[in-house]
Amino acid sequence: MKKTIAWKMAVAGVLIAVCVVCSPLSIPVGASRCFPVQHLVNILAAVLLGPFYGVGMAFVTSLIRVLMGTGTLLAFPGSMCGALLCGLVYKYSKNIPLTCIGELFGTSVLGGICAYPIAALLMGKEAVLWTYILPFFVSSAGGTVIAVSYTHLTLP
């Protein structure tokens, strides 16, 4: 099946809607909210759409969640770094388990590092750099487990 721009935009819109509708399923951990559905969608976007659609979807979803009051500013670095890394990993490897590891590393380590200046400068929260890595890992791990199960059952 040829994936046209219209098809990709439609799938992206549906996945963004799933993330926004499932926003109440977040779990507070530390200064952030763990949102496993975002990480499931990041992996699905990597496999179905590619890295740049994934980053765009993560941005739009985070923006909508912040505007609705169901997310924090920390949603941006975690979801976008995870989406970019897992998208790039899948683009070049076509390996779903490796893509899931990319999502875990991108969200927890890279997203956690990028969250520090946002928390310190924009939110006024003083913390050490590694404070955000563990909560982001917990959130990403939940979504990654769901994604591995889902992709194993539905994708070839």
Show the residue positions of the predicted features.
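Loop-helix junctions at membrane interfaces
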Residues: 1-153
